[in-house]
Swiss-Prot record:
This is Chemoreceptor McpA. Its main location: membrane. Keywords: Cell membrane, Chemotaxis, Membrane, Methylation, Receptor, Repeat, Transmembrane, Transmembrane helix. It is found in: Cell membrane. Residues 634-657 are annotated as: Disordered. The gene is mcpA. GO terms for cellular component: plasma membrane. The chain crosses the membrane at residues 6-29, 189-212. Residues 354-583 form the Methyl-accepting transducer domain. Residues 216-269, 297-349 form the HAMP domain. The modification Glutamate methyl ester (Glu) is found at residues 385, 392. It is a multi-pass membrane protein.
Length: 657
């Protein structure tokens, strides 16, 4: 099997391979970067729009359950202290409505959570239903028997503590899911950045090496052919053209040079034969001299025309054609030379057109790199805005934690006030006891007064009897005794009334002491419950602080993603700079190709060398265009098909990429 050499490949393949490879790798890297950015954006959107919202919804539900618990104890406290009793029924109805609303929200939240977290929400809903049943029982009994209704608070409190623990587990699972997703996306972004940097460096190295190798080998081949042509034009036929044999378009020039060299050797042989003819007879010599002169004249004509053509070829003018009428066997040499010049001219046209496509491709690569850089910067700006939104969300959670701490402080203050109220009630009980004791003493004193009035009445009666015995002399004393008796009777009646009032007051004071004692016991239970509420609110505040810490970690992860995107943007800028460097190398190749004159249309091929890099032509596929031109050159008889091929790349634009 014949080995394929680089010099045997067509120039269109050697020149178009480097930009085609660069376009392919750029498309792969850009596609990978876009996929990674879309994946990162989708993950971040999921965290912000789903996980964060679910986490906040769980926190709101936890706060609402705490409010239900607090509102229930407020109703019990008001009932115990006989404060706004007429509003208790409305408050209990509102508590039941809020409990049903929380259950509805939990059912809606359950359908949005992952399957592994739904059982926890189901347990929470079951606990809430049991709490709702307990609240309904308390609502029905609070107006009938307060003490029995207070006894039903204990099951509700147990379910409330259970629900608080379940909510903490759900929040912890949500935070763990958010942190895991953030770590996964950060690792993915780091790996994508590393792969992109490595591929960019490898692509730049490969494209640079291919472009340098193609330019240098083509330049060396052209210089070697030009040097060989110059030597042949000076009569040096010793040059070895076999080493320069190749299968590309330049091989046609080498073949023409071989024909020219063989003809030169043949002419030298003719000169040698002419020298040998000097020894022949005069007639033969004259005839041979005439023949030799004619042959020499023909050879001179051929040599002069071919020398002129080779001189034009050495100067880069490929439009020259031998127009002189060569005699005899030299006509094939003329036709071969003109065919070689025509083939070389068409080949250089294709090379120039390929150079045009290479320049256009470099412009498109630079344009695509600029677009990719701009999109990466836009993605970085979007991540920066997302980081700002997460900062605001973190601040909101921190304010929620601060509100929970304030609620804890308020509950602590309420607990102190309730304790103080219990002390006041205890003092009132003691004062009522003292009043009851004083009432007993007053009753004893009134009894003594009653006995004194009775004795006074007896003494007044005896005094009246003695005054009556005394006759007229004791009449005044009898009047005085009568008045004293009347006063004693009124004192006895007043003492009886006061004693009855004191007895009634003592009974009422005893009842008041009993009621105040019951109130003290109720307040003591309320103080205990308020203490439990204080502990629960403190736990809620701690949970809110932990959530704020978790959001802060998520915010840190988003900021790291923002930094990675900024690094990607810097890498894209480096790739853009390398692309512009490749564009400069292409311009240098265009400048070298400008040395050759290839006839009509040649000026259009040199246009990319001076084109403004800031103005981009309509997007097209340069490799497909040059392939169409090569097909036109190879099959001139199919102009209509070539035109169709030339128009086809217009639909192959990759500008939208």
């Amino acid at each position: 099997m014949k080995r394929i050499r680089l010099v045997d490949l067509p120039l269109i393949i050697k020149i178009g391979f480097a930009p085609a490879f660069a376009l392919l790798m750029l498309a792969v890297m850009a596609g990978g970067a876009i996929l990674v950015q879309k994946s990162q954006s989708a993950a971040l959107k999921q965290v912000v729009e789903r996980d964060m919202r679910q986490n906040l919804e769980i926190q709101r539900i936890s706060k609402r359950i705490s409010n239900i618990n607090g509102e229930l104890f407020v109703v019990m406290t008001h009932k115990a202290g006989n404060i706004d009793v007429d509003k208790n029924d409305a408050r209990m109805a509102a508590v039941l409505v809020e409990t049903d609303a929380v259950k509805k929200d939990l059912l809606a939240l359950k359908s949005k959570l992952p399957a592994e977290e739904q059982p926890k929400i189901a347990e929470l809903i079951k606990s809430l239903e049991e709490c709702r049943s307990a609240i309904d029982t308390v609502s029905g009994m609070i107006s009938v028997d307060f003490n029995m209704a207070a006894g039903f608070i204990a099951p509700f409190e147990e379910q409330y503590v259970k629900m608080t623990g379940q909510l903490d587990q759900v929040v912890a699972a949500a935070n763990q899911r958010i942190e895991s997703e953030s770590a996964k996306r950060q690792a993915q972004a780091t790996a994508a950045m590393s792969v992109t940097i490595i591929m960019s460096l490898l692509t730049l190295g490969a494209v640079g090496a291919l472009a340098f190798l193609t330019v240098m080998t083509t330049r060396k081949s052209i210089n070697d052919i030009a040097a060989a042509t110059d030597k042949l034009s000076k009569g040096d036929n010793s040059i070895d053209l076999e080493k320069m044999t190749r299968g590309d378009e330049l091989g046609g020039i080498v073949t023409a040079l071989k024909v020219f060299r063989d003809n030169q050797v043949h002419l030298e042989q003719l000169r040698a034969d002419q020298e040998k003819s000097a020894a022949l007879t005069a007639d033969e010599r004259r005839s041979k001299e005439a023949a030799a002169a004619a042959a020499a004249q023909e050879a001179s004509l051929v040599v002069s025309n071919l020398a002129e053509g080779l001189e034009k070829l050495a100067s880069g003018d490929l439009t020259f054609r031998v127009t002189a009428d060569f005699p005899g066997d030299y006509r094939k040499l003329k036709d071969d030379f003109n065919a070689a010049m025509g083939s070389l001219q068409e080949t250089m046209k294709v090379i120039a057109a390929s150079t045009d496509g290479l320049s256009t491709g470099a412009d498109e690569i630079a344009h695509a790199s600029d677009d990719l850089s701009r999109r990466t910067e836009q993605q970085a700006a979007s991540l920066e805005e997302t980081a700002a939104a997460l900062d605001e969300l973190t601040a909101t959670v921190r304010r929620t934690a601060a509100g929970a701490r304030q609620a804890s402080d308020v509950v602590s203050t309420t607990r102190g006030e309730a304790t103080h109220s219990g002390q006041v009630v205890h003092q009132a009980v003691s004062a009522m006891g003292e009043i009851e004791k004083s009432s007993g003493q007053i009753s004893q004193i009134i009894g003594v007064i009653d006995e004194i009035a009775f004795q006074t009445n007896l003494l007044a009666l005896n005094a009246g009897v003695e005054a009556a015995r005394a006759g007229e002399a004791g009449r005044g004393f009898a009047v005085v005794a009568q008045e004293v008796r009347a006063l004693a009777q009124r004192s006895a009646e007043a003492a009886k009334e006061i004693k009855a009032l004191i007895s009634s007051s003592t009974q009422q004071v005893s009842q008041g002491v009993s009621l105040v004692g019951q109130t003290g016991e109720a307040l003591q239970r309320i103080v205990t419950k308020v203490g439990e509420i204080d502990a629960l609110v403190t736990e809620i505040a701690a949970s809110a602080a932990e959530q704020a810490t978790g959001l802060n970690e998520v915010n840190t992860a988003v900021n790291q993603m923002d930094q990675v995107t900024q690094q990607n943007a810097a890498m894209v800028e480096q790739s853009t700079a390398a692309t512009h460097s490749l564009k400069g190398e292409t311009a240098e190749l265009v400048r070298l190709m400008a040395r050759f004159q290839v006839g009509s249309g040649s000026s259009s091929y040199a246009r990319p060398a001076v084109a403004d890099a800031g103005h981009h032509a309509p997007a097209r596929n340069p490799v497909a265009e040059q392939q169409a031109r090569l097909n036109t050159f190879a099959r001139p008889g199919r102009s209509s098909g070539s035109a169709a091929l030339a128009q086809a790349p217009a639909s192959d634009g990759w500008e939208e990429f």
